[in-house]
Curated annotation (Swiss-Prot):
Source organism of this protein record: Bos taurus (Bovine)
Uppermost EC category: hydrolase
Subunit and interaction comment: Interacts with TMEM39A. Interacts with SEC23A and SEC24A; this interaction is reduced in the absence of TMEM39A. Interacts with PLEKHA3 and VAPA and/or VAPB to form a ternary complex.
Sequence ranges on the Lumenal membrane side: 542-548
Main function: Phosphoinositide phosphatase which catalyzes the hydrolysis of phosphatidylinositol 4-phosphate (PtdIns(4)P), phosphatidylinositol 3-phosphate (PtdIns(3)P) and has low activity towards phosphatidylinositol-3,5-bisphosphate (PtdIns(3,5)P2). Shows a very robust PtdIns(4)P phosphatase activity when it binds PtdIns(4)P in a 'cis' configuration in the cellular environment, with much less activity seen when it binds PtdIns(4)P in 'trans' configuration. PtdIns(4)P phosphatase activity (when it binds PtdIns(4)P in 'trans' configuration) is enhanced in the presence of PLEKHA3.
Name of the protein in question: Phosphatidylinositol-3-phosphatase SAC1
UniProt domain SAC: residue ranges: 122-451
TM segment ranges: 521-541, 549-569
The entry's keywords: Acetylation, Endoplasmic reticulum, Golgi apparatus, Hydrolase, Lipid metabolism, Membrane, Transmembrane, Transmembrane helix
Membrane topology: Multi-pass membrane protein
Gene responsible for this protein: SACM1L
Length: 587
């Protein structure tokens, strides 16, 4: 079977069936989904009834079972990102979720409400920016992985050969994946970030591409998904590949990021920065070893760059990480701790060169992947930098962009684009493209995990820290605080539902969505607001004497402050927590 999926499709809808027609040249296949039995079969175009309602679609994302029954999810709009070795790369920009059922009369009021909530969750994930696909190219693998494949691999369908870590609709495609004959309708979709640019240096034109692939294992939002799970999957794991294509030669440099691979948590509790807690009873070495065993198999040597603070609440995590690496004693793993905030305080971001100089020799050893126009591999990447901070976002983004630039400098010199002694930083036009692309990558990764754009992107875009950048960081930090405390439970539930970590069972006697709230959840905020309002009123409407006014103000002021601290003490009861999957049971 050729490793392609159908590019042009039409969806024909009748009350009994969905017909997905392949419209590529010479294609006669029609995928038929029975809306009653949910059976999936392959047929031909003559079986499409003329009475069907028809519209174009650009791919099948998959199917999901909710309270009302099954739903078909299709891509209705797409945007061309660019061409990748003559393969077109698309971004899915709009979707439609179609019910198999014609009516909802079989549902109770509670079931209707639950189904509406589950639909809202699905639509929330679909509204997240960053879903990419190609009908002819496997986006889930790096150039180096694709260069080292068998003829049998080349004949597999895109779905079969895809790296399952990065297929975000893998759960949605489970019914189609069970039937190889319909795999040309099964479109693997990547979540992350892709940008492509045609660039010129010294009159030599080359394509520069940046791809970030988010893992769907242990996926979620900032404070609810930290550390690793029992399989060794790290939270917020992202593989970032930088690619150069010049005169038929291809080069790539791969980096990874992922949460500190221990069992730890940092649950939101209304405090600006919740205290990270390391699990005291878990077998950390088991999960830690699983994580790095798989990383070494996939990528080779591991150079860990740990950017967390080496004092305060982050210090125990840094010490535990260093201890685990030392205890494991694996020669394939190197550990470097760099206190980013301490080294770069007072906007001394030039001090990042200390870290770059420290790892320069290691980076030369790891090398990069390079293949000539004839397909001969001239160089392979022997390992990766695995960078992390607490969120694996802001500090990590800055370091990754600097390491990638150093690799790109070496690649472009070897390819003959840069002259000997020429610096990439001196190429103003390309530098602007490079910095903006890495800042856009940072924003995409941050929005997907933390809910806002990245911090510190003014440095990534301009090469220096600015006062405006600090103000924007403050604004984004406030938005993060609100989302992390008051909307991330819903976001986490949405991701768990989409990825199949939770399966809807309409026969469940108790809906996980209906969580009774304690009386204090309503009473305490009302008391605090009333007390604060009375305090203001007493200030504005003075009593007969200043002592009387002071007494009233003190009484209501103490009442409002006291209530505030009671709410803060019980912070975990007031945040928006996930309801579908209780992750603390496996943390």
């Amino acid at each position: 079977m050729a490793a392609t999926t159908y590019e042009r499709l039409k969806l024909h809808v009748t009350p009994e069936k969905f017909y997905v027609e392949a419209c590529d040249d010479g294609a006669d296949d029609v995928l038929i989904i029975d809306r009653v039995s949910t059976e999936v079969t392959l047929s031909v175009k003559k079986d499409i009834p003329p009475s069907a309602v028809t519209r174009p679609i650009f791919g099948i994302l998959g199917t999901i079972h909710l309270v009302a029954g099954n739903y078909l999810i299709v891509i209705t709009k797409k945007k061309k990102i660019g061409e990748f070795f003559n393969h077109v790369i698309w971004k899915a920009t709009d979707f439609d979720v179609l019910s198999y059922k014609k009516t909802m009369l079989h549902l109770t009021d509670i079931q209707l409400q639950d189904n509406k909530t589950f639909l809202a969750m699905m639509n929330h994930v679909l509204s997240m920016d960053g879903f990419y696909f190609s009908t002819t190219y496997d986006l889930t693998h790096t150039l180096q992985r694709l260069s080292n494949t068998s003829p049998e691999f080349q004949e597999m369908s895109l779905l079969e050969r895809a790296d399952q870590r990065f297929v975000w609709n893998g759960h949605l495609l489970r019914e189609l994946s069970a039937q190889p004959e319909v795999h040309r309708f099964a479109l693997p979709v990547l979540h992350g970030f892709i940008t492509m640019h045609s660039c010129s240096i010294n009159g030599k034109y080359f394509d520069w591409i940046l791809i970030s692939r988010r893992s769907c294992f242990r996926a979620g939002v900032r404070y609810y998904v930290r550390g690793i799970d029992s399989e060794g999957h790290a939270a917020n794991f992202v593989e970032t590949e930088q690619i150069v294509h010049y005169n038929g030669s291809r080069a790539s440099f791969v980096q990874t990021r992922g949460s500190i691979p221990l069992y730890w948590s940092q649950r939101p509790n209304l405090k600006y920065k919740p205290l990270p807690l390391i699990n005291k009873v878990a077998n950390h070495m088991d999960g830690f070893q699983r994580h790095f065993d798989s990383q070494i198999i996939i990528y080779g040597k591991q150079v860990i760059i740990n950017l967390v603070n080496q004092k305060g609440s982050e210090k125990p995590l840094e010490q535990a990480f260093a201890t685990m690496v030392s205890s494991l004693g694996n020669g394939m793993i190197r550990y470097i701790a760099f206190d980013f905030h301490k080294e770069c305080k007072n906007m001394r971001w030039d001090r990042l060169s200390i870290l770059l100089d420290q790892v320069a020799e290691m980076q030369d050893e790891l090398s990069y992947f390079l293949v000539d126009p004839a397909g001969v591999v001239l160089s392979t990447q022997e390992g990766v930098f695995r960078s992390n901070c607490m969120d694996c976002l802001d500090r990590t983004n800055v370091i990754q962009s600097l390491l990638a630039r150093r690799s790109l400098q070496a690649q472009l010199q070897r390819l003959g684009v840069l002259h000997v002694g020429q610096k990439l930083e001196e190429q103003d036009e390309f530098e602007k493209i490079y910095k903006n692309a890495w800042a856009d990558n940072a924003n995409a990764c941050a929005k997907q995990y933390a809910g806002t754009g990245a911090l510190k992107t003014d440095f990534t875009r301009t090469g220096k820290r600015t006062q405006l950048g600090l103000i924007m960081d403050g604004w984004n930090s406030l938005i993060r605080y609100y989302k992390n405390n008051f909307s991330d439970g819903f976001r986490q539930d949405s991701i768990d539902l989409f990825l199949g970590n939770y399966s809807v069972d309409e026969l469940e006697s108790h809906s996980p969505l209906s969580v009774p709230r304690d009386l204090k959840f309503l009473a305490l905020p009302i008391i605090m607001v009333v007390a604060f309002s009375m305090c203001i009123i007493c200030l504005l409407m003075a009593g007969d004497t200043w002592t009387e006014t002071l007494a009233y103000v003190l009484f209501w002021g103490v009442a409002s402050i006291g209530t505030f601290f009671i709410i803060l003490y019980n912070g975990k009861d007031f945040v928006d927590a996930p309801r579908l999957v209780q992750k603390e049971k496996i943390d």
